[in-house]
């Protein structure tokens, strides 16, 4: 029994480490770096009132129907309409075990469990979900299921929310640190 636990633990650790060693090739998900505000990650209050959550990504603006490409290569974990705020959405598991989310899409051009390459079209820009009254955009965010514990004690964004939200920083990475700047 101890041997099984030891082998299983080593295997899980090896898989996690391999995921972190895979190089991350990057592409701009949509449009150009000039089409998003670099200071909107963790902006608060993002929703009406002061009880809303901080903004967990950046909104990249463009025209309805503009191509949205995968920022990195990976496995599509979700590709369908998500009722409520997100609308049509795609989630891609990429290197370093990061989940890249693309929300408010017009069309979805990939399917669950597809492998995508960096720069491969996965959707088109839209206004779905709670973005119907805003200019067309893709909300792009990066989630890490393996928490970065040290981030819970820091701050992010240009308008720091109440500390009750800081634990979420362990799981949400600032997309502007991973997008091209030019």
Where are these regions (language model features)?
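Sec-dependent signal peptide hydrophobic core
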Residues: 5-13
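Acidic, glycine-rich catalytic/binding loops that coordinate metals and/or anionic ligands
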Residues: 30-35, 112-120, 136, 141-182
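Glycine-centered loop/turn positions within well-structured domains
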Residues: 58, 66, 98-100, 108, ...
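A generic structural motif
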Residues: 61, 93-95, 143
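Zn2+-dependent peptidoglycan hydrolase active-site motif and core
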Residues: 70-109, 135-139
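Active-site loop architecture of trypsin-fold serine endopeptidases
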Residues: 125-139
């Amino acid at each position: 029994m101890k041997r099984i636990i030891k082998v299983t633990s080593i295997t899980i650790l090896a898989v996690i480490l391999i995921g972190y060693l895979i190089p991350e090739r990057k592409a701009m998900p949509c449009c150009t770096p000039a089409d998003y505000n670099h200071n909107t990650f963790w902006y608060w209050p993002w929703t009406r009132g002061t009880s809303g959550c901080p903004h967990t990504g950046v909104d990249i603006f463009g025209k309805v129907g503009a191509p949205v490409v995968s920022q990195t290569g990976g496995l599509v974990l979700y590709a369908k309409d998500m009722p409520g705020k997100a609308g049509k959405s795609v989630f891609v598991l990429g290197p370093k075990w990061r989940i890249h989310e693309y929300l408010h899409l017009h069309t979805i051009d990939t399917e669950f469990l597809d492998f995508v390459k960096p720069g491969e079209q996965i959707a088109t820009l839209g206004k779905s979900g709670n973005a119907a009254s805003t200019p067309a955009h893709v909300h792009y965010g990066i989630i890490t299921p393996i928490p970065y514990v040290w981030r819970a004690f820091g701050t992010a964004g240009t308008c720091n929310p109440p500390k009750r939200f800081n634990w979420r920083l362990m799981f949400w990475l600032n997309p502007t640190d991973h997008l091209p700047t030019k």
